[in-house]
């Protein structure tokens, strides 16, 4: 029988529910259980694919092409699993499916209501996530906080699950803030008490509390929360602020969180062996050398827009025994006159993905600087496309060269829309999304990075591609297309082999990086940056 764990939040949003859920998932996996995890987002968008990064952070793409919440990146990195489209569910997606069923007559003339139709659809998503992965345990995180009007159907579905599958197969974990008032010199439990009261008013009694706090709460605070919130004292778990998020599973294990969960769900498993994870954390905590990487991006005011990029750089730093000293450079502010001032002290430059005209010329300047000064450079998605544009302008002398996305009237559309995208009008969910194979050129930097594999599978999110009409012209000038689709239609990886490291990929390698298995292209880039350290 599949076991279901539901993680809710109270008091404030962005409290770390996703990290708590991911940490628990890691502990349960290391107990020998097969774990999957999903995120419920109560917003009305179908998915975050068309949302501004300033609103939502990065869009995380799964193997099967779902555009999802950035928390799925935490889930995959912590638990080291590949999730699918059932791992992110929004209000918009549920209502869209319910309304389509109504139009098809599948409700046989019934009045379509939140209960049972919407809640049934939500429960079906929970169960489908478990069955499609054949998991022993599924962890479901509900976005937002208890009390949000948007969350009510989701919480009602969670309440019903207990009756549907039995109390021994369901566990509710509530994450709240435990604020410390300096003026009073004490921690305040009332916000948590009121949050639990609100949750109980919706029919859900939490079995465990996870309290986010800046300093240890002490047993007396835990006992007070246990008494007023009707949970066992040992089931009040502290989530202390830490220097590195990968410490959190170890902190949770030290408080017997996973054992309490297994006892409640009647799961008999050996203790989680976290030796390898602990060794990784010890290494992370004791890195002495730093390598400076300049990230030239459009959305640098909100680092969450590049969350997976940053994590992949960190993972590759672990492999190279260095910490990443990240220098955020706003591409919109980069010019030919100030580029040296902005990135001249960097050991490596990364130009990540993005959409739209703003900042594109600044990214091109950064790529030019890297090429002309032989600074290790990694381009990703739009970064790869602009690498081609920069080469066309400044090496091939194709003045006015650009991407047709950025300048539809360019005389040299080095990057053009994919053929199967031409007649598509909808923006959401219509990009080239998900896992695709890339055939690597023997002897190339890309092939060397991937241990001389002939083919790698990587995740994509783009609508435009390199225009192959220009391929011969590029190759004649020494530009190497070191990764292509198996049918040779799509240019996936480009490089200049005479440089220390000048490689760009159309796909998003960062989406498959893990703390205990860094993505290979990122690792090759960081290695080159370390060798270039000033």
Curated annotation (Swiss-Prot):
The active site is at 381 (nucleophile), 508, 510. The keyword Membrane does not apply. Pathway: Pyrimidine metabolism; CTP biosynthesis via de novo pathway; CTP from UDP: step 2/2. UTP binds at residues 13, 188-193, 224. CTPSs have evolved a hybrid strategy for distinguishing between UTP and CTP. The overlapping regions of the product feedback inhibitory and substrate sites recognize a common feature in both compounds, the triphosphate moiety. To differentiate isosteric substrate and product pyrimidine rings, an additional pocket far from the expected kinase/ligase catalytic site, specifically recognizes the cytosine and ribose portions of the product inhibitor. One of its GO terms (cellular component) is cytosol. Allosterically activated by GTP, when glutamine is the substrate; GTP has no effect on the reaction when ammonia is the substrate. The allosteric effector GTP functions by stabilizing the protein conformation that binds the tetrahedral intermediate(s) formed during glutamine hydrolysis. Inhibited by the product CTP, via allosteric rather than competitive inhibition. PROSITE patterns: GATASE_TYPE_1. Residues 292-534 form the Glutamine amidotransferase type-1 domain. One of its GO terms (biological process) is 'de novo' CTP biosynthetic process. Its EC number is 6.3.4.2. It comes from the Bacteria. Homotetramer. ATP binds at residues 14-19, 71. CTP binds at residues 13, 148-150, 188-193, 224. GO terms for molecular function: ATP binding; CTP synthase activity; glutaminase activity; identical protein binding; metal ion binding. Residues 1-267 are annotated as: Amidoligase domain. HAMAP family: PyrG. Belongs to the CTP synthase family. L-glutamine binds at residues 54, 354, 382-385, 405, 463. InterPro entries: Class_I_gatase-like, CTP_synthase, CTP_synthase_N, GATASE, GATase1_CTP_Synthase, P-loop_NTPase. Catalyzes the ATP-dependent amination of UTP to CTP with either L-glutamine or ammonia as the source of nitrogen. Regulates intracellular CTP levels through interactions with the four ribonucleotide triphosphates. Mg(2+) binds at residues 71, 141. This is CTP synthase.
């Amino acid at each position: 029988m599949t076991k279901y764990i539901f993680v809710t939040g109270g008091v404030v949003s962005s409290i770390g529910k996703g990290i708590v859920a991911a940490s628990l998932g890691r502990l349960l996996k290391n107990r020998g259980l097969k774990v999957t995890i999903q995120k419920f987002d109560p917003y009305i968008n179908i998915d975050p694919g068309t949302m501004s990064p300033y609103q939502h952070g990065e869009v995380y793409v799964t193997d099967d092409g779902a555009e999802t919440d950035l928390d799925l990146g935490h889930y995959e990195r912590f638990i080291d699993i590949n999730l699918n489209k059932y791992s992110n569910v929004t209000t918009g997606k549920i209502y869209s499916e319910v309304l389509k069923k109504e139009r098809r007559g599948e409700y046989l003339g019934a009045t379509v209501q939140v209960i049972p139709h919407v809640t049934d659809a939500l429960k079906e998503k929970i169960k489908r996530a478990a069955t499609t992965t054949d998991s022993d345990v599924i962890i479901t995180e509900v976005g937002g906080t208890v009390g949000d009007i948007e969350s009510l159907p989701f919480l009602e579905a969670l309440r019903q699950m207990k009756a549907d599958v039995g109390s021994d197969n369901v566990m509710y974990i509530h994450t709240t803030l435990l604020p410390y008032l300096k003026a009073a010199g004490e921690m305040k439990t009332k916000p948590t008490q009121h949050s639990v009261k609100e949750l109980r008013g919706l029919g859900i009694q939490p079995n465990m509390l996870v309290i986010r706090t800046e300093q240890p709460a002490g047993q007396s605070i835990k006992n007070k929360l246990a008494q007023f919130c009707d949970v066992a004292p040992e089931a009040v778990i502290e989530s202390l602020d830490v220097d590195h998020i990968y410490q959190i599973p170890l902190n949770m294990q030290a408080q017997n969180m996973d054992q309490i969960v297994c006892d409640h769900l009647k799961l008999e498993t050996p203790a989680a062996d976290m030796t390898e994870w602990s060794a990784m954390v010890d290494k992370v905590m004791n890195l002495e050398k730093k390598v400076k990487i300049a990230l030239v991006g459009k959305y640098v005011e909100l680092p969450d827009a590049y969350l997976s990029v940053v994590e992949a750089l960190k993972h590759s730093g672990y492999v190279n025994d260095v910490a990443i000293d990240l220098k955020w450079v706003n591409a919109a502010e980069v010019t030919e006159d100030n580029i040296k001032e902005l990135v001249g002290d960097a050991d490596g430059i990364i130009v990540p993905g993005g959409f739209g005209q703003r900042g594109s010329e600044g990214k091109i300047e950064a790529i030019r600087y890297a090429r002309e000064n032989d600074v290790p450079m990694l381009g990703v998605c739009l970064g790869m496309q602009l690498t081609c544009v920069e080469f066309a302008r400044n090496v091939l002398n194709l003045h006015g060269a650009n991407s047709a996305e950025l300048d539809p009237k360019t005389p040299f559309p080095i990057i053009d829309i994919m053929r199967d995208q031409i007649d598509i009008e909808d923006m959401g969910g219509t990009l080239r999304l998900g896992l695709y194979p890339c055939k690597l050129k023997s002897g190339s930097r890309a092939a060397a990075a991937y241990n001389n594999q002939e083919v790698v599978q990587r995740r994509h999110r783009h609508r435009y591609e390199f225009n192959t009409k220009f391929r011969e012209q590029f190759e004649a000038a020494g530009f190497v297309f070191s990764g292509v689709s198996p049918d040779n239609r799509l240019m996936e990886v480009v490089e200049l082999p005479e440089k220390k490291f000048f490689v760009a990929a159309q796909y998003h390698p960062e989406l498959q990086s893990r703390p205990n298995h860094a993505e290979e292209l990122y690792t090759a880039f960081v290695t080159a940056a370390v060798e270039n350290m000033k």
